[in-house]
Amino acid sequence: MSILSALTSISNPMKSTKSSVANGGGRLSMGSNSVACGSCGGGNSSSGTINNADGSQTTYYSYTSPVYTYNYSYSYSSSGSSSCGCH
């Protein structure tokens, strides 16, 4: 599943999406995509990173109960998908 179809297939009335696709020196930028995923209980917080094809790292989600926020910026040679929920 592509990142775009993954985002558009999430049916959540709380989601807000801002996307822009541009070729900036061989990079595909999805801009700022955030999804409010609802409560997961607890009061925890965490974040995750991905390694980009150019060697940089991108924080792709942060979680502070009760909301997950996902942010995507992928190069052409990378792929990924998103999902809402408690991981």
From Swiss-Prot:
GO terms for biological process: sorocarp development. The gene is hssl8. Residues 1-22 have a biased composition (Polar residues). The lineage of its organism: Eukaryota, Amoebozoa, Evosea, Eumycetozoa, Dictyostelia. PANTHER family: HSSA/B-LIKE PROTEIN 1-RELATED-RELATED, HSSA_B-LIKE PROTEIN 1-RELATED. This is HssA/B-like protein 8. Residues 1-24 are annotated as: Disordered. It comes from Dictyostelium discoideum. Belongs to the hssA/B family. Signal peptide: none annotated.
